[in-house]
Curated annotation (Swiss-Prot):
UniProt region (Disordered), positions on chain: 1-27
Domain PUA stretches: 238-313
Broadest EC class assigned to this enzyme: isomerase
Reactions mediated catalytically: uridine(55) in tRNA = pseudouridine(55) in tRNA
Organism for this UniProt entry: Pyrobaculum arsenaticum (strain DSM 13514 / JCM 11321 / PZ6)
The protein's name in its UniProt record: Probable tRNA pseudouridine synthase B
Disulfide bonds: none
């Protein structure tokens, strides 16, 4: 998957004061680590929690968190945020996923019939989580964007599936087997993408360890900066809103982002969408939910535009130019 390119609507041209904040590329190595995340290629065997704990230990930070749990037997793309970056993991909470599964059918299947059944499973489907699940087992709907047969050999099939967050790939394979009348089970599963973060840019635990060692031993952070991504990248797939210097600290204290505090923004977005708020230097301030759609923002001169849900920027990075008294978001 690729992130779609959005147009930028300029509400008001605004300079940024170089005395406040700094572009992400100018952060020191320590600052960079604390405001970073990594697209990890999780191996089969350990749990997602164990892998995140290893990243935390390697980088010497107090916390690390992952988005989109992978079972121990599943490999592939696992985004892990570090230190301050964990505050905005919800940016990936509703992200769609792409998997490649190896299915074994319990009887012979016709290729054309299989392709036809795969087409039937595209769109809205009903699913009940499997018995061994961390969530309540109640019927729910999930969207399947595409199912593609990559290979069929004997009773084994390789199927690529692009699905909504929270979809159980194993259950899809089981249900396909039921519709075909032969039964099926999943033999192997790999996640190849989380939204527009793909396995092509994923790194291994060894890469993370090597990059950190080279920086500590030789003072060269070049490899470190290629293995870890700046936390700003976690919002790659989200609509972006650039905040005027005068409004940044209010958002850092949890205030809603109001129309006068906006310099420019990407279009389109709808009411209720998760959006990312950036400084004019390109620093991620936080994320929240749009209270209005982008077309309305174009005309607004006052009023709240974004409800601030999570803040990653430290308070006081930009000077306070606002009236206190508004409720703070979680930081």
């Amino acid at each position: 998957m690729r992130c779609s390119q959005r147009e930028v609507f300029v509400k008001r041209e605004e300079p940024t004061n170089p005395e406040w904040g700094k572009p992400p590329s100018q952060r020191t190595a320590d600052e960079y680590i604390r405001h970073s995340f990594v697209i990890l290629d999780k191996p089969r065997g350990p749990s997602s929690h164990e892998v995140a704990a290893w990243v935390k230990k390697i980088l010497g930070v107090e916390r690390a968190g992952h988005a989109g749990t992978l079972d121990p037997k599943v490999s592939g793309v696992l985004p892990i945020a570090v230190a301050e970056g964990t505050k905005v993991l919800m940016a990936l909470s509703r992200s769609d996923k792409v998997y490649v599964a190896v299915a074994k059918f319990h009887g012979d299947v016709d290729e054309e019939r299989l392709r036809a059944v795969l087409r039937e499973f595209q769109g809205e489907i009903y699913q009940k989580p499997p018995l061994r699940s961390a969530v309540k087992r109640q019927l729910r709907t999930r969207r399947v964007f595409s199912l593609e047969l990559l290979e069929l050999e004997g009773r084994y099939a390789v199927i690529k599936m692009h699905v909504e967050a929270g979809t159980y790939a194993r259950k899809i394979i089981h249900d396909i087997g039921e519709v075909l009348g032969v039964g099926a089970n999943m033999r192997e599963l790999r996640r190849v993408a989380v939204t527009c973060f793909t396995e092509d840019e994923a790194v291994t635990l060894q890469d993370v360890a090597d990059a950190y060692y080279i920086w500590k031993k030789y003072g060269d952070d070049t490899y470190l900066r290629s293995v870890l991504l700046p936390i700003e990248e976690i919002a790659r797939h989200l609509p972006k809103i650039w905040v005027r210097d005068s409004a940044v600290d209010a958002v850092c204290h949890g205030a809603p982002l109001a129309a006068p505090g906006i310099s420019k923004f990407e279009v389109p977005f709808s009411k209720g969408d998760i959006v990312a708020m950036f400084t004019l230097k390109g620093e991620l301030v936080g994320i929240g939910r749009a209270l209005v759609d982008s077309e309305e923002v174009k005309k607004m001169e006052r009023g709240a535009v974004v409800r601030t849900d999570r803040v990653v920027m430290r308070r006081g990075t930009y000077p306070a130019m606002w009236k206190k008294g508004q409720r703070a978001a979680k930081t």
